[in-house]
Amino acid sequence: MMKLNTVLSFKNIIGLMLIIFAGILFYAYILQHEWQYVTLSDEQVKKYRISGKKALSLYQLMKDTHELLTKNNIKYWIESGTLLGAVRHQGIIPFDDDLDIGIMHEDEIHLQQILPQFEQLGYTVSYERAYNICKKTCLDIFIVHKEKNKFIYTNIMLRDKYPEHFFYDHELYPLKKYKFGSIEVYGPSDPIGNLNRQYPEWDKYAIIYSPHSLHLPFLSNIEKKTKFILTPELLKPAQPLGPLEDNVNIVNSAKFIRIYKDIDDH
């Protein structure tokens, strides 16, 4: 009788383990394939917003980049999450923490020549599939070329990783200005097709999770698979919008004064 009870007990343990394993697989499947739809209260939105310091740093970085590239006749456009922010929020997405822009391959050498100007403003410059301009926050400059009727990344690894990140000829040009917080930036002529490819239902829902969202380490697996219904609070851009420094003109003025002083001394 004791031997029979032991066998039954062993079978029960095996059965329980199988049930638990099946439950884990089912839960994993749900997380991978099923999206949750949630409406956040205004108070809950604050949980996901980037800090005010980070927002100010991002706007300053975008302002400095816009002014340096424009001053040096390098045409650029905002793209990816930065473009989504300009279209949907008229500024930085409140839970985004970097900036993305593109330039044409023909302007890459010119860009390389002016990178020291970013360093004069206190930014560090590096390259890994894109040019990275960083201080407290980072901006990526992607290099693009035209292939048939599409503008695509020149970097093959980026093309393979983000096959939907492209513009058709009529979508990109002519570039136009977008409101971006308290400043204006350049972006594509018609962004809708590009946004639809990258962010389906972007005009109805926001997805908080991004692999580089370092300010959100607390996100649960469920939150990562949640589409948050857009509310007026969620549509507000990252804040504050300013005040922003006039760094590019200040550096240029300082250089002019030094040159003038050197001439005067001679």
UniProtKB/Swiss-Prot annotation:
Protein localization: Membrane
Gene Ontology molecular function, alphabetical: transferase activity
One cellular component term from this protein's GO annotations in UniProt: membrane
Pfam family, one: LicD
Organism domain of life: Bacteria
Key word DNA repair present: no
Membrane topology: Single-pass membrane protein
A GO BP annotation: glycoprotein metabolic process
Keywords: Membrane, Transferase, Transmembrane, Transmembrane helix
Transmembrane annotation, as ranges: 13-33
InterPro entries in the cross-refs: LicD/FKTN/FKRP_NTP_transf, LPS_cholinephosphotransferase, NAD_Glu_DH_ACT3
Similarity comment: Belongs to the LicD transferase family.
Protein's UniProt name: Uncharacterized protein RP689
